Swiss-Prot record:
Database matches in Gene3D superfamilies: 3.30.190.20, 3.40.50.790
NCBIfam families assigned to the protein according to its UniProt record, in alphabetical order: rplA_bact (TIGR01169)
Species in which this protein is naturally found: Bacteroides thetaiotaomicron (strain ATCC 29148 / DSM 2079 / JCM 5827 / CCUG 10774 / NCTC 10582 / VPI-5482 / E50)
Keywords from the named record: Repressor, Ribonucleoprotein, Ribosomal protein, RNA-binding, rRNA-binding, Translation regulation, tRNA-binding
GO CC term (a single one): large ribosomal subunit
Name of the protein described by the UniProt record: Large ribosomal subunit protein uL1
Source species taxonomy: Bacteria, Pseudomonadati, Bacteroidota, Bacteroidia, Bacteroidales
Recorded superkingdom: Bacteria
Coiled coil regions, renumbered to chain: none
Length: 232
């Protein structure tokens, strides 16, 4: 490993090795140890006591963060002509159908979320090879396949995110920006962890939330005591 920069040294000094911080402490500390010139994203990693290889222990869901993600989310709506006006009014960045399907077939994926209607899914199935690996495939479980595309656009723009546990049992997602206040960071983290708790599979045995780490794009991870999440 190369030499630590001055800022990395300062950050390392602020984090006590082996200590599990309260969520309240971590929400302030992550701001103190981030020295980027840009507004870094805040990431949370939660290790769950599940075996994701078993279908009855898969954890996936959606959560509406009270303060949003701080990111500009680019939304494409693939819909029938009668739904286009409502989708545009709701704030969709791109609205249409066949022309965008052709663009995606050609490799265009300059978007963050795709919302569509059940009747359109037959056309979108062929795009799986392009959209699947990028996590862009619309899914009824995440609310991106719906008759009410306008409502779905508003929810995504306001901070609704979807997530799922990876092969190693970790759920990783972004819950805001370093510019958020400690209270906003804490509120978003609490909402996310509360949602995970509600999704605990009945087949999961033992400790469900094994560890929680909060970090920014360029910072070290701060270990959080899971018991502190519900503290007022």
């Amino acid at each position: 490993m190369g030499k630590l920069t001055k800022n990395q040294k300062l950050a390392a000094e602020k984090i006590e090795a082996g200590k599990a911080y309260s969520l309240k402490e971590a929400a302030s500390l992550v701001k103190e140890i981030t020295f980027t010139k840009f507004d870094a994203s805040l990431d949370i990693d939660v290790r769950l006591g599940v075996d994701p290889r078993k279908a009855n222990q898969m954890v996936r869901g959606v959560v509406s963060l009270p303060h949003g993600t701080g990111k500009e989310v680019r939304v494409l709506v693939l819909c029938t002509p009668d739904a286009e006006a409502a989708a545009k009014e709701a704030g969709a960045d791109y609205v249409g159908l066949d022309e965008y399907i052709e663009k995606i077939k050609g490799g265009w994926t300059d978007i963050d979320v795709i919302i569509t209607m059940p009747s359109i899914m037959g056309k979108i199935g062929a795009l799986g090879r392009v959209l699947g690996p990028r996590g862009l495939m619309p899914n009824p479980k995440s609310g991106t396949v719906t008759m009410d595309v306008a409502k779905a656009v508003k929810e995504v723009k306001q901070g609704k995110i979807d997530f799922k546990v990876d092969k190693s049992g970790i759920v990783h997602t972004s819950i805001g920006k370093v510019s958020f206040s400690p209270d906003q960071i804490r509120d978003n983290a609490k909402e996310f962890i509360s949602t995970l708790n509600k999704l605990k599979p009945t087949a999961a045995k033992g400790t469900y939330i094994k560890s929680i780490y909060l970090s920014s794009t360029m910072s070290a991870g701060i270990k959080i005591d899971p018991k502190s999440v519900d503290e007022i």
